[in-house]
């Protein structure tokens, strides 16, 4: 067998490989001998079928299987001998001429093929003990807890019927039935029965709630609005509509007394227990935000200290996934690049940079995990599946079965667990200092954190 490297351009490599016909024929014969004791043919006793006869019957299919196996093993040897880690699947170009193919399968001609690959670069890891990371910490104060309780009370506020003849005001809850039309024609989703609307809540199409002010029970109004340009339905976005609306109930919000009785309506033993629960929830919320900020710092530091050319094909794959998502989101929201004060060309350039960063950081994290034998256990994956199932009450078995039968979905669950374990490993070595900050400071530039690799 002969191997000749024909391309060595950056991370791209290409090889021409020659496998002598004699080597292929020898492996085919060995495979046929192995089959001799297993094949049953009419007219022959078990194990007594001549290899020459087997070759006439099965030679072509065995040769095809042998060549496929030989190509895979040869390629693996080429890559292993040179210490290559592949960024993508190798691109193999086999002979296309039918006569040449038949001669190869018949053992009359050598096999000549090319294999093109893109390799992962050698990554020199930084000294993580030199990393300095600032950990923002927010104490959960009594005022934070009180504000959280107030929000809970507002969300659970009771309403009571207003006096007969009373009109609806901002803050009141009006129960309405309506039928919507566009240019006099009813449309899907435009009809509602006994729908509660809190005036001023902003939960309906802009302008709808405002026009309910002053309405009374039994009164019918024609409410004229326009669907927002970024409305989820393309058929409705930006169009004017009329809703023939009848109020069936007008209720005023009732004062909420935040005490033990209120806490009991929420299933808590007392107000103190409700405050404990609110404090714990806020603590978990702040801890999650702190984790994101620390992780962003760490990823930025890894980006700064690991500069290398990422495999172009991986960058292109990452970019295409991001670009499809961005375009789908913009289309759904009725936005254009001009609305975002940019151009498509500038946006493409920016997202290619982000894709390059994500690929490089992914390779760095993988290298760290591999060199330090960091692994995700089956128990950790199972816990992640269970947590996902809990988020879909009533469909737990469906979720569990989905992940058990879908390796790709399991890999998507495994990836963030692996990344977090690598991050924790680095943080154990880095110099981490805590800094007290306010809630506002903790959540500053939160959007930037969301785009971190």
Curated annotation (Swiss-Prot):
Just give the chief location class: cytoplasm
Q: What is its EC number?
A: 5.2.1.8
Intracellular or extracellular location(s): Cytoplasm
Ranges for the PPIase FKBP-type domain?
A: 171-256
Leading EC class: isomerase
> Which molecular function GO terms apply here?
peptidyl-prolyl cis-trans isomerase activity; protein folding chaperone; ribosome binding
The reply to whether Acetylation figures as a keyword in the UniProt entry is no
According to its UniProt entry, the protein's GO biological process terms are:
'de novo' cotranslational protein folding; cell division; chaperone-mediated protein folding; protein transport; protein unfolding
Q: Which UniProt keywords apply?
A: Cell cycle, Cell division, Chaperone, Cytoplasm, Isomerase, Rotamase
What are its GO cellular component terms?
Answer: cytoplasm
Q: Tell me the domain of life.
A: Bacteria
Question: Pfam family example for this protein?
Answer: Trigger_N
- Catalytic activity line of the entry: [protein]-peptidylproline (omega=180) = [protein]-peptidylproline (omega=0)
Domains: entry comment? Consists of 3 domains; the N-terminus binds the ribosome, the middle domain has PPIase activity, while the C-terminus has intrinsic chaperone activity on its own.
The record's function comment reads: Involved in protein export. Acts as a chaperone by maintaining the newly synthesized protein in an open conformation. Functions as a peptidyl-prolyl cis-trans isomerase.
Instruction: Output the NCBIfam families linked to this UniProt entry.
Output: tig
Q: Which family does it belong to?
A: Belongs to the FKBP-type PPIase family. Tig subfamily.
Name of this chain's protein: Trigger factor
Q: What is the lineage of its organism?
A: Bacteria, Pseudomonadati, Pseudomonadota, Alphaproteobacteria, Hyphomicrobiales
């Amino acid at each position: 067998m002969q191997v000749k490297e024909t391309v060595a351009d950056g991370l791209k490599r290409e090889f021409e490989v020659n496998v002598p016909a004699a080597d292929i024929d020898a492996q085919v014969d060995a495979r046929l001998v192995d089959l001799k004791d297993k094949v049953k043919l009419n007219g022959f006793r078990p194990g007594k079928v001549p290899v020459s006869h087997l070759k006439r019957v099965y030679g072509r299919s065995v040769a095809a299987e042998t060549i496929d196996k030989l190509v895979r093993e040869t390629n693996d040897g080429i890559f292993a001998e040179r210490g290559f880690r592949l960024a993508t699947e190798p691109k193999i170009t086999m002979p296309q001429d039918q006569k040449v193919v038949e001669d190869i399968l018949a053992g009359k001609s050598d096999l000549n093929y090319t294999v093109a690959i893109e390799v992962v670069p050698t990554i020199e890891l930084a000294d993580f003990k030199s990393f300095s990371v600032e950990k923002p910490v927010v104490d959960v104060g009594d005022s934070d807890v009180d504000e959280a309780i107030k929000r809970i009370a507002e969300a659970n506020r009771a309403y009571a019927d207003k006096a007969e003849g009373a009109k609806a005001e901002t803050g009141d809850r009006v129960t309405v039935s309506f039928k919507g039309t566009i240019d006099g024609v009813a449309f899907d989703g435009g009809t509602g029965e006994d729908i509660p609307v809190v005036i001023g809540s902003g939960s309906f199409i802009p302008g709808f709630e405002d026009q309910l002010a002053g309405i009374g029970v039994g009164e019918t109004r024609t409410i004229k609005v326009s669907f927002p340009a970024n409305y989820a339905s393309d058929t409705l976005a930006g169009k004017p509509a009329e809703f023939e609306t009848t109020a069936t109930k007008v209720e005023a919000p009732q004062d909420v007394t935040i005490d033990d009785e209120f806490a009991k309506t929420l299933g808590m033993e007392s107000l103190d227990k409700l405050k404990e629960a609110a404090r714990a929830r806020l603590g978990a919320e702040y801890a999650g935000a702190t984790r994101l900020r620390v992780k962003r710092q760490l990823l930025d530091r890894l980006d700064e200290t690991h500069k290398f050319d990422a495999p172009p094909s991986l960058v292109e794959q990452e970019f295409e996934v991001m670009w499809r998502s961005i375009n789908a989101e913009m289309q759904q929201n009725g936005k254009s690049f001009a609305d975002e004060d940019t151009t498509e060309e500038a946006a493409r350039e920016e997202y290619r940079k982000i894709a390059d960063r994500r690929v490089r950081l992914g390779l760095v994290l993988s290298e760290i995990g591999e060199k330090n034998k960091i692994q995700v256990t089956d128990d950790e994956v199972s816990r992640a599946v269970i947590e996902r199932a809990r988020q879909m009450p009533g469909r737990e078995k469906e979720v569990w079965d989905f992940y058990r039968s879908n390796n790709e979905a399991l890999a998507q669950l495994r990836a963030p667990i692996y990344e977090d374990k690598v991050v924790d490993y680095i943080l154990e070595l880095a110099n981490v200092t805590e800094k007290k900050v306010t809630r506002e400071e903790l959540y500053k530039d939160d959007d930037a954190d969301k785009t971190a690799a």
